[in-house]
Amino acid sequence: MSGIFNSELDSILEGTSRSFYLSLKELPRAIRPQVSLLYMLARTSDTIADSEGGEPKELLEALESYDDFTQGRSSDAPALSSFSQFQTNKSEGLLLKNVETVVSRIEGFSDSDQEAIRSCLGIIISGQILDLNRFSLAEEDLASIEKNDELDDYAYRVAGSVGEFWTRMSLTHLFKLDSEKEKELFEKGIRFGKSLQMINILRDIPSDLALGRCYIPRKSLEEHKLSPQDLLDKSKMESFRPLYDEYLDLTSKYLESAIQYIEMIPHSQFRLRGSCMLPVIIGKRTVSLLRGRNVLDRKDRIKIDRSEIKEVVKQVVMAVPFKGSSKRLLRD
């Protein structure tokens, strides 16, 4: 992975990408820098949006300023150093301090790649701005998404769009498909991205509630005679379970699309298939864990441990050269 940008930026990338770094480092060289840079750019905006040291309006202004800077609408870099001191993750603080250096890397790519990076980043930031307006500027202490369409829109903006970008980079630099198959791959790529965001949402309900954010739509809760406030009470899990299972089922459908996405990638693209397999397998195992646990219990955080992740990496490396082994591992 070394040598993508420079030692400092590569270190920041590894420090901020956590488990996603496992996929980034397996990507083919032809698209690894573009995807890695988009990740760093999106991680910067996410860090701004989630900074605990700023008032909501300050964060919104900083996010909009960052958006203008990355899109080339402004030549003035946003002043983010004041937010860097509040980051518990040292690498995220360094990311904010190095915003000019990171953004300048966009111009190192072809015009079409620059356009793709900026387009996807703009969509992601639009989702983060919506999030800030919806939650941080809300009058109530616990604000909620209202309906399923809003949840789907959010999942597309912050994650489905990344699947779209990933697909565009792959089709531009790695392999070609006919127009019908290309359209299908884009659709499945969007669902792939949404699946990973839905897992985050369904796993992190207690921590989001603690921040005054409820991503489970209010109307869906009301249909089950529940409110966002009810989700603060872990004893409400059995009442919440039927609705929660509906969202897990939706996530599983998205993961099935992700598997189909991988199966559409040419077999010879070992690195690309392997980098896609990792989050899908980990995602499927996370969904299985979520089905049997009380997700409303803040003390019972559901997480795949590092030893199991390392084992998954080994399994993928062993399986990816073989069609049968890859299929069994994905569909096990």
Where is each model-derived feature located?
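Catalytic cores of Mg2+-dependent Asp-rich isoprenoid enzymes
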Residues: 1-195, 206-332
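Short, contiguous alpha-helical
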Residues: 200-201
